[in-house]
């Protein structure tokens, strides 16, 4: 899917909408909003005497009363929109006197924009937009944020002239100006942990089962089944609803994410696809998958995830839809360890009580950047301060505001954007109505202590998975996960000794491969082929970096080398 518009202020030409099946026309005109559906869908609904509401993407649900979306001031009521339409999509309101646009809950699918004195441009691709306006890839602040946090924190892109629309916001264009305004605050769905009884857990599980079934297509689809809780819970719901589906997983042949799902799918009588990431993949597909993944994500992704593209290309030969457990674990358990999803610097920003994180950021940046990023770091610290203070929240609630508004879209977004070129990834856990209900309970990660590390306290969210499986499929409810214990060990209080024993046994007997997806081998070969050993033209080297930092810095370096390459030639989406 793809969209583009160049809107000229005070133009005598009215705004038009043009639907395209797979590609833009050879001549792209001003004042026309081009909507390219690609593997997704494009639909519209008319609001009499007011305008037309367009949806581009893969929405789940239907608008019962579209006129209720439009507030008296012309803004879109995002609470109503997100309640009625789940899924990943971009929306466009073409009214009599304005165009407004934004994204679905979580802002996973981006809206990029560029503003000049006499016009504003919007697009789903920052690279395409940069090509149209001849924008140089010159945003050093973007580079700095990725060096520190693995992804940009706020609205920065590779290009100073192009910004990313914030999540849960609306960009409006009238005849004379444009504006960006946030329409839904975290406080609207952050909730308070007022529900804690078994009946509340049962009600939450029933709500999820009902909502989850809406995400599951009528035709055959795939479900990501791993050794953990997220995927098997989705399998349980699909079995309960007698859906036509197959399961799949990817990894090295010896990994638990291959062996456990394949073995358990067989017991359940399910067709299972094992996508093996061994020598054949490394030799024939990994490098190309890196290049394509990075290009299709506008180089906002990272080079350590080529297996997502490889698996999407294979699965697209079987189905147009997959249902995955993306976002699941993060909703229920308190995030706490540095890694690919969050760096030690991000943890420091949200956990430091004395604001000494600022000094530590300065020390870190000067250790590899000398004084080259002084101006950018000063501005970044000011913006972080403002972000921390403006919510009025503290602790884990303040951090989870960042998770919902920034982390989800920056970490999972490039993956889902890339997958859209092959198929549709439906993610039932990121559902506004469900999240709103979850955050009223003690099982939400929002209400856990900040960066809680106690393993057994962090298991509280697994009670939800256990309850869903208890009411969905008793076989899955009793099957062990790759963690060594089964959902019923968590869901039945009398089995706590069994849970403790199995957890300890797994911890001491675990012989799991350290590199399930052969990322080490992929990165080593890619570095040799690309001849990258540092950030170009900066003096910053990759020497002594841990794996996660190396992957992300290598991704930045690779993106820099590709900024002037001709990767805008294709307009097929």
Regions from the PLM with identified roles:
Residues 1-225, 229-280, 289:
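Cysteine-centered catalytic environments shared across enzyme families
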Residues 97-100, 110, 175, 188-396, ...:
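ATP-dependent adenylate-handling active sites, centered on carboxylate activation for C-N bond formation
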Residues 406-407:
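Short beta-strand elements
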Residues 502-509, 513-573:
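Long, compositionally biased intrinsically disordered regions
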Residues 6-8, 481-484:
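Generic extreme N-terminal start-of-chain segments
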């Amino acid at each position: 899917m793809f969209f583009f518009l160049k809107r000229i202020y005070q133009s005598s030409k009215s705004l038009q909408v043009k639907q395209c099946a797979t590609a833009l026309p050879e001549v792209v005109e001003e004042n026309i909003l081009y909507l390219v559906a690609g593997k997704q869908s494009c639909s519209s609904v008319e609001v009499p005497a007011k305008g037309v509401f367009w949806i581009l993407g893969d929405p789940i649900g239907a608008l019962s009363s579209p006129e209720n979306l439009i507030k008296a001031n012309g803004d879109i009521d995002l609470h109503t929109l997100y309640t009625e339409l789940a899924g990943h999509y971009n929306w466009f309101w073409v009214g009599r006197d304005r165009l407004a646009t934004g994204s679905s809950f979580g802002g996973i699918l981006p809206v990029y924009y560029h503003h000049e004195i006499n016009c504003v441009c919007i697009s789903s691709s920052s690279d395409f937009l940069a090509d149209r306006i001849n924008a140089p890839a010159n945003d050093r602040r973007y580079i700095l944020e990725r060096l520190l946090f693995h992804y940009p924190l706020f609205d920065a892109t590779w290009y100073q002239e192009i910004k990313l629309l914030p999540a849960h916001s609306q960009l409006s264009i009238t005849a004379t100006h444009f504006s960006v305004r946030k329409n839904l605050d975290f406080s609207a769905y952050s909730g308070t942990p007022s529900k804690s009884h078994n009946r509340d857990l049962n009600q939450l599980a029933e709500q999820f089962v009902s909502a989850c079934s809406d995400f599951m297509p009528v035709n055959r689809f795939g479900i990501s089944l791993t050794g953990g809780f997220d995927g098997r819970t989705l399998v349980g719901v699909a079995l309960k609803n007698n859906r036509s589906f197959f399961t799949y997983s990817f990894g090295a042949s010896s990994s638990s994410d291959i062996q456990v799902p394949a073995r358990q799918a067989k017991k359940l009588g399910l067709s299972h696809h094992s996508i093996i990431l061994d020598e054949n993949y490394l030799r024939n597909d990994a490098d190309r998958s890196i290049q394509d993944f990075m290009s299709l994500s506008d180089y906002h992704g990272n080079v350590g995830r080529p297996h997502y593209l490889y698996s999407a290309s294979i699965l697209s030969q079987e189905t147009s839809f997959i249902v995955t457990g993306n976002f699941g674990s993060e909703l229920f358990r308190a995030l706490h360890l540095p890694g690919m999803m969050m760096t030690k610097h991000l943890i420091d920003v949200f956990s430091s009580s004395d604001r000494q994180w600022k000094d530590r950021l300065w020390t870190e940046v000067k250790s590899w950047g000398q004084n080259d990023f002084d101006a950018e770091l000063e501005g970044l610290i000011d913006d972080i301060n403002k972000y921390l203070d403006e919510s009025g929240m503290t602790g884990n609630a303040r951090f989870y505001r960042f998770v919902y508004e920034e982390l989800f879209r920056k970490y999972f977004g490039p993956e889902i954007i890339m997958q859209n070129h092959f198929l549709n990834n439906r993610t039932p856990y990121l559902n506004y109505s469900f999240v709103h209900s979850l955050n009223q309970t003690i099982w939400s990660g929002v209400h856990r202590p900040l960066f809680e590390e106690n393993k057994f306290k962090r298991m509280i969210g697994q009670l939800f998975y256990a309850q869903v499986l208890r009411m969905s499929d008793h076989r899955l409810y009793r099957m062990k996960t790759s963690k060594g214990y089964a959902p019923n060990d968590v869901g039945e209080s009398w089995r706590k000794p069994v849970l403790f024993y199995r957890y300890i046994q797994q911890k001491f007997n675990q012989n799991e491969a350290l590199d399930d997806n052969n990322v080490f081998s992929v990165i080593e070969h890619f570095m040799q082929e690309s001849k990258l050993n540092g950030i170009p033209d900066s003096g910053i080297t990759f020497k002594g970096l841990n794996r996660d930092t190396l992957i992300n810095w290598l991704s930045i370096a690779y993106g820099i080398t590709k900024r002037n390459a001709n990767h805008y030639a294709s307009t097929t989406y």
